Structures are given as C-alpha cells and as structure tokens.
From Swiss-Prot:
Tissues in which the UniProt entry reports expression: Widely expressed at low levels with highest levels in bone, cartilage, kidney, liver, bone marrow and primary osteoblasts differentiated for 21 days. Detected in the subendothelial layer of the aortic intima (at protein level).
GO molecular function: BMP binding; carbohydrate binding; DNA-binding transcription factor binding; heparin binding; molecular function inhibitor activity
Disulfide cross-links: 80-134, 94-148, 105-165, 109-167
Effect annotated for changing residue 21 to L: In CDD; affects protein secretion
One GO process term, biological-process aspect: negative regulation of protein-containing complex assembly
Subunit and interaction comment: Interacts with LRP4 (via the extracellular domain); the interaction facilitates the inhibition of Wnt signaling. Interacts with LRP5 (via the first two YWTD-EGF repeat domains); the interaction inhibits Wnt-mediated signaling. Interacts with LRP6.
Primary localization class, coarse: secreted
The protein's name in its UniProt record: Sclerostin
An example Gene Ontology CC term for this record: extracellular space
Species per Swiss-Prot/TrEMBL record: Homo sapiens (Human)
Function per UniProt: Negative regulator of bone growth that acts through inhibition of Wnt signaling and bone formation.
UniProt KW keywords: Disease variant, Disulfide bond, Extracellular matrix, Glycoprotein, Heparin-binding, Secreted, Signal, Wnt signaling pathway
Length: 213
C-alpha cells in the first residue's frame, strides 16, 4: 500500500510542476537537442544584416584581389626624383665663364604623394605592378659665354638643358634589341606599294642580242 501511494504523490508533484510552468507562459518542453528561449520564441527572426559588414565570409571583387590604392595606370599620377646637377660647358679648350644648372632624371618612379619629400610615405611597389622609368620631359635653351686661353676672343654658345622630368611606362617590347636588325637589308617594305622591277642595263641587252645570232 505504501509503494502505490508514493508513486501517486510523485505523479501529482510532476503534474503540478508542469501546471506552474504553463501558467507562467513558458513553452512545452521538447525532447530534442534544440534549446528554446522563452523570450525569443520557437523560431527567432535572424538579426538584420549590416550593409558594411566586412567580416562575412563571402567572395568580393569577383574573387580577385582588391584594387591597390597606389597602383594606377595613369602616368600623370607618377613622378620621379629630379636631381640638380651643376657643370661647366666646354668646347675644346674653351670653357664657360659660369657653371650651368640642369636636371638629371634618375631614380625609381612612384606616386607623387609618396616621394621622399612628400607626407605619408609608404611602401607602394609590388612585383605585379606596372614598370615606369624616369626620362626628360621638357628642355630649355640657354646661351653661355665661353672663355678660351691664349688671348682668343670669347665666344657664345647655345646649349640645351633638361628643364623637367616625367615617368614613362615600359612595355614588353622595350629592351629587346636582340630582336632588331639594324642592317641595311632589314629595311621594311612600304605598305601599299609594289616593288618595281629593276631596269636592265644597255650592256646586258646588247649581250643578249649578240647571243641571239
């Protein structure tokens, strides 16, 4: 008699506990591996996706690496270092009375804002980036006076000096001098014109006539 009475009391306590849970608004317990939070409900709504979410694991830019901010195809955005060089102009034994100053275009080309005298320097060069070289851009003419030894009268001479430099993009056809033939036989034929047959000389025609008889 005591065992059935104890079982009835246990069943009554369990039933009372379920009633209390349902009275507080909780959902029924489920025998699965999913935890149900009463405040969110059985099927919680996903949080809104942020527009500028860069942490998501998704392909961007079509699977290509992002555009490097310092790699540009516009040659005007590149600049090279201009070195000032002072020298005397000579013409045989004569030499200029005063030295002249011109620019020497040298160094590696890079973005103008990343030059050594600019603010915000950084590493911009990449192996896959385009190749540029520094070449003279504009020239200026200057007249100098040459002094000659031996009591000769001074003479004037006009020299051409570099005024500014620029960057030029290299192509895959540069530095391929071994593919070029600088001989006279490698002259390219002009397009649209047919080669003219060479006129026979009078001596060759006379020899043919003599052999005919």
């Amino acid at each position: 008699m005591q065992l059935p009475l104890a079982l009835c009391l246990v069943c009554l306590l369990v039933h009372t506990a379920f009633r209390v849970v349902e009275g507080q608004g909780w959902q029924a317990f489920k025998n699965d591996a999913t935890e149900i939070i009463p405040e969110l409900g059985e099927y919680p709504e996903p949080p809104p996706e942020l527009e500028n979410n860069k942490t998501m694991n998704r392909a961007e830019n079509g699977g290509r690496p992002p555009h490097h901010p310092f790699e540009t195809k516009d040659v005007s955005e590149y600049s090279c270092r201009e070195l000032h060089f002072t020298r005397y102009v000579t013409d045989g034994p004569c030499r200029s009375a005063k030295p002249v100053t011109e620019l020497v275009c040298s160094g590696q080309c890079g973005p103008a804002r990343l030059l050594p005298n600019a603010i915000g320097r950084g590493k911009w060069w990449r192996p896959s980036g385009p190749d540029f070289r520094c070449i003279p851009d504009r020239y200026r003419a200057q007249r100098v006076q040459l002094l000659c030894p031996g009591g000769e009268a001074p003479r004037a001479r006009k020299v051409r000096l570099v005024a500014s430099c620029k960057c030029k993009r290299l192509t895959r056809f540069h530095n391929q001098s071994e593919l070029k033939d600088f001989g006279t036989e490698a002259a390219r034929p002009q397009k649209g014109r047919k080669p003219r047959p060479r006129a026979r000389s009078a001596k060759a025609n006379q020899a043919e006539l003599e052999n005919a008889y």
